[in-house]
Structures are given as C-alpha cells and as structure tokens.
Amino acid sequence: MADEFFHAGKENCSEQARRSQVSGPRSQFQRSFIQRVTLLGKLPTRFVLHRERKQKVAAILGVDQEAMKSLPEGDLDHCLLSKVDLRRQQISQTMEEVQKIIHLLTTEISRQDSRFEAVPVSDTHNESIKVLAPSLFHVTVPLKGLAGYKGVQRQRWRYYNVQGAKLTCPLRDPEGLQQWLETEMFMKTLWQWHKADVNIEGDIVPAKVLQVFRTLVENAVRTCHLSGKVTVLEKRTTVWVAMETSTGQVELELAPTVEIPTTWPEKAQWPRCLKRWPSPERVECIKSFGFNLVAQSAYHWQLSFSQAEQVLFEQLDEDGGCRRQCFQVLRQLKEDVWCPGRRPVITTHHLQTVLFWTCEKYPHLKDWQVFHQALLRLVRKLHRCVSQHFLKHYFVPKSNLLQSANPSELDAVAQKVAFFLKNPQVELP
C-alpha cells in the first residue's frame, strides 16, 4: 500500500509542478502530501539483523553483547533503537508544547500586522518547526502578501544602510545561499511591503523586517500573558526566544520567511549530471515544492529548501534499506557523545546533509542492507566534513554549511568522531 501511495504521489506531484504557474501561498496538496509521507515514515518498520551480525552491531552501539544473545530476533530492533525511541518521545512532548505557544504568539502577531501569518498546529509533521537539537528549534513564520514570484532581478549597485543613509561604497553582492529581494520580483504585493519600515529603494530588507518582527514578538508575549514562560533574547541579529517546557528550557529562532512554491531557484543546480539518486520522477516531485527565502542577515535573504529536504528524507527507504535508521543512530551519537549541549556546532540539518551526499554516492539498496557498514560509512563522511571544516549544501554545493562555525568546536567534534572510528564502542548515556 505504501508503494502504491508513493507512486500516486509522484504522479500527482509531477502534475502539480506542470500546472502551477504562479507563486503564492503553499497549496493544500503540498501541505497534505508532506503530512501523509511523514505519517507513513512513522509507521512501525522491521529492522532485520541477521544473527551473525549481532556482535558487530552491539559493539558499534555499546550494547551489552551477552544481553543481546538472550534476546529473541524480533526484539533486536527495539534494543538497539531504544535510545532513539526515547528521544522521539521527549521531542514529541516538547514539540506539542512549543507548537501551542508559537501558534498563540503568531496568531496575535498576525492580528497586529497582516504581513505575518500564524503558524498552525499540526498532529503530524509541522513544516514550520525544525528540530536542530533537543533544546534548539528553528521556526519559520510565513510572510503574506507576496505572490507570483518572477525571480527577475535588476542589476544595480546598492548604496544604503539599514537606516536608509547613503553609503560611499556599494553593498556586497549576495553569495552562496543569499539573494536580494525586491517588490518588483512579485506579480502581486500588499501595499504594506512598500512602506519604509521594511523597504529601501524597492528592496525588502531582512534587517528591517526583523526589527518590525522583534517588536511584534515582544508585544505578543505581553498581550498573551506569557512573560513568565517566554523570554525574547537580547543581543541576537535574528529573533530568538527562550521557552520553558515540561522537559526543560528550549531556545527557538523565529525567522520571517517568504514561501515560493513550485519555483526552483537558478542557484540550485540539481540534480547533478550522471547521478542515479534520486530517480528523475522523484527529482521532479521534490523540485515542485519550491524553496523559501528566510530573513537571517542584514541585507540578503537566505535560500532554504526545508520542504524539499523533508520530502526527500521521508521517502529514503522505499526500497527497504536502513538509511533512516542509520541517520537516527548517528544523530543519537552526535547528541549524546560527540556534540552535546544546548547550542551544538553540528545540528540535525548538518547530519541530514551528510546523509543526502552519502545516499547520492551510494544509490543502490545493497549499500544500505548491512546496518553496521552503512552506519560507519556515514560516520566516516561526517568525520571528513568536520575535520576539513567543509560541508557542501546538498542543493547549492558552492555554499559551505560550516563556514561560520567555530573552528575549535569543530576540531573537538572531529577528535571525538575519530576516536569512535578507531574503537567503535560507545556507551550511550
């Protein structure tokens, strides 16, 4: 049944990509598609481990080998992934609380300023909230009133600062995942996007959007009587809040985001030539989800492919491989052993990118049938990236995701991962 659904999903997704001509709010089809593939991804799966592999897998995960010998074959997956399951339960509880507060805040923000859209509550996967670490979340707050993305930019120099004053030297051009955002790049715009509180010389300036948004967040915290539960953090270039939950304090980055569905940016030269993964049909489906532009810097908007990445991740193991299980164990090792802490230098998004590059290099099912070999392959890839301080973005390879990371923190992680590779026996806390 799952195969039938994904086959139908690919056909429907391809048809959606052909028919959609105008950018605007993300379609109901795309939202429901993401929720359905996520729900399928959470269904119980059998993780088959042959008896002769027990000791190797136990050594990798630090599980007591004698205890494993006494376990029935069907209970091995539960034993090995028990830490992963515990994490999932804790994150689920935290996510439920975070969603409710974020929905409450953004509903009030949207009431105050119609350019900002409320973040909905979801029973399955919330496409607006991404877990970077157990106590670190990234929340995209959709912006309204920008529809019909054309993507045509005027070639011109910009001589202004955030205050609107004239500069003697032009601003630098965007690099990597960055780009300008002009009102003329859309077929339809609300008149509020032309106001001086966010617009300079026709550009929608992310720093000014963040200034407006920060004030709205502070007002919403007071209006919703959440001052004892939510704190807006100071001295941050973007908007961060600390939130008290039943599992402890978490930090969230609230990022105003322009959603651009059905359009694929020129900077994303994907798929690459002569690559067998993913399939052409899957590529067409994924690209139909488009991309986002996120306010995270002063003058340039940041390209984000969160929806495309989510769909790609959820459909990894249709062939029965163990890619996602390997990723979950890799993430657990990262969070518990190699890179713990509230604001880790390596996040879940970095690990997901490592997984995508490895899947592209090893596209066949045979490469993802032996768990311990597949896991160590991922660990080696992670070690190379961290030790070299270089991890290419999967869709925009010219961008290094570790460029702004702390070098000494990366070196410390690389040392721990190298130690694991020499002696892959780790006791998870």
Swiss-Prot record:
Ranges of compositional bias, category Basic and acidic residues: 1-18
Chain spans, region Disordered: 1-25
Cross-referenced SMART domains: Mab-21
N-terminal signal peptide: none
Family to which the UniProt record says this protein belongs: Belongs to the mab-21 family.
Protein name: Protein mab-21-like 3
Annotated source species: Mus musculus (Mouse)
